[in-house]
Amino acid sequence: PGLVDIHFHGCAGHDFSDGTPEALQAIGAYELRQGVTSICPASMTLSEETLKTVCANAYAYTKRPEAEQDTGARLIGIHLEGPFISMEKKGAQNPAYIRNPDVEMFLRLQEAAHGLVRLITIAPETDGAKEFIRRLADQVHISVGHTCSDYETAYRAFSQGADHVTHFFNAMPPFTHRAPGV
C-alpha cells in the first residue's frame, strides 16, 4: 500500500493541465518513486476544449498497456479545480475561463474523461451552484472552494450534497467569531 494524493497540479517539471501523455507518464513515475501509488490530480481553470483534452489524456493514461502499469502511480480520478469558482478568490486560476457552474459543460467533460472526474471544486454562492449540486451530487464529489461563501451558503451546499472542501482556509474568507465562513 502507498499514499493517495487527491490534490496536486504537477511535479517533475510537468503539470497535469499540460494534458499530454508525456506529462502524465512523468508525473505518474515521479509520484510512484515518492511512495504515492494513487493520484487524483487537479486541473487548472482552462477553456472547455483544453479541459476535454486533459480529461481524454488522463483516461488514456489509465488504459496504458499492462507492461507500463507498474511504471507510474495509478490515476484513480480527476479533480476539476475550476472553472466554476469565484472570481474574487481565484488564486492562481486564469480569470478568462472562470464561469458559473454549468451542468451541461460538466457532463461534456465527464464524457471526455469516460467518467473519471471524481471531484469538482465550485463556489456555492455563484449563480447555478445550487442546481449544479442538486443534479450532480450523486455522480461526483462536490468540493466547496475558491469561494466567497458565508456560513449559511456553505451549510446549504453541504446539506444539498457537497462533501469536500478544497484547501480549507485558502482562497476563501477568513474564519472569525462573527462570520465563520466555510
Please report, for each region that a protein language model flagged, where it lies by residue:
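Charged helix-capping and loop-helix junction motifs
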Residues: 20-23, 54-57, 102-104, 178-182
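Divalent metal-dependent hydrolysis catalytic cores, especially in the metallo-beta-lactamase
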Residues: 9, 25-54, 72-86, 113-125, ...
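Short, electropositive alpha-helical surface patch
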Residues: 51-69, 132-141
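Active-site core of metal-dependent hydrolases
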Residues: 111-182
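Conserved phosphate-binding/catalytic loop of the ribokinase/pfkB sugar-kinase fold
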Residues: 86-112
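A glycine- and small-aliphatic-rich helix-loop capping segment at beta-alpha/alpha-beta transitions
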Residues: 19-23, 94-98, 163-164
